[in-house]
Amino acid sequence: AASADEADVYGFLNQPPVEQVRRIYTIDEVKRSSRLRDSVRRLEIGDLTFDTGKATISRNQVGSLSSVADAMQKMLQRNPGEVFLIEGHTDAVGSDVSNLVLSDQRASTVARILSDFYDIPPENLVTQGYGERYLKVKTEAAEPLNRRVVVKRITPLISYASAK
């Protein structure tokens, strides 16, 4: 989503899952199952950067969420029941436990910005941190590309109407 505009992001998030949805799942089932999460498209917020050990972003990075927020607003106008999963990730520096907490905080930071700055209703956002479990770059080093947030539209997995 680094330089994608709202129409590109909308088109991407609005695509059906990459495999057929077999049944309706709970949000907790989606959060726990990488197979389920991998069945929907992932949108990395490429312009967001987190410092090592930090869950905050600088004020000038808030704008990097505008195309994602605009696409979400458009989808919510069409279907107020849309649900988006905000995933937080860390690099491999630090303990597993501290990275899980940090990744949760990163996901929550992005969800809060989407709600506070872009008026995305909090009830349409679900957050989950995965720590260092899903490294983008396989390294134990402090790799900035691993300190990221991913947005997924999980509505087709949790809603009968959208799974048809």
Predicted regions and their residues:
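Periplasmic OmpA-like peptidoglycan-binding domain that tethers envelope proteins to the cell wall
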Residues: 59-62, 87-164
